Amino acid sequence: MNQAKRIVFLSSLLLLTFNVLNAASLKVGVIGLDNYQAVAFANLFQTAKPGEPLAGFEVVAAFPGGSPDIPESVQGLPRWTERFEQMGIPRVNSVADVVERADVVILMSLDGRVHLKQATPVLKAGKPLYIGRPMAASLVDVLKIFQLAKAHQTPLFSCSQH
């Protein structure tokens, strides 16, 4: 799936969530700022004009995350975190802070090993969740994530262009 299709697919999920929550605006939280996709999605939300499909979406919290043993994460984190700061998006200190501030969450951490841990509080709080690639580092973790979503009746979505 190419980047444009992925963005349309994510946007559709968030619009569905937007309609389900029946809100005039939707507060989006971002977990994992160590890749360009987190910036791309945040930029789409922050720059939508009234009347456009993503109007009313606002990124209200961003938790950097990062994995010290993944070179791409180490190299990308400062660069992409700075872009979030340039957009005026508040940086928070934990996943719990994101959950507290957001209506919906996008989990964009490069490291699939942390996805179950990062997704758990989001799903337990009943916040709709999109997980970027990879869904998780193992099938066992993927199944646990979906079990949590089902147990807490929380919308969950993931996809990849690769």
What positions do the PLM features span?
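N-terminal glycine-/serine-/threonine-rich beta1-alpha1-beta2 phosphate-ribose binding loop
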Residues: L13, A23-A125, L143, A151
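A general structural signal for short secondary-structure boundary/capping elements
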Residues: Q75-L77, G132, S138
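Short, intrinsically disordered, low-complexity terminal segments
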Residues: M1, V20-L21
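Hydrophobic residues in well-ordered beta-strands that form the structural core
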Residues: N93, I131, L156-S158
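Bacterial N-terminal signal peptides
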Residues: V8-N19
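Short helix/strand-capping hinge loops at secondary-structure junctions
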Residues: G126-P128, R133-P134
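A contiguous active-site-proximal alpha/beta segment in oxidoreductase catalytic domains
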Residues: A136-H162
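Bacterial N-terminal signal peptides that target proteins for export
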Residues: M1-F9
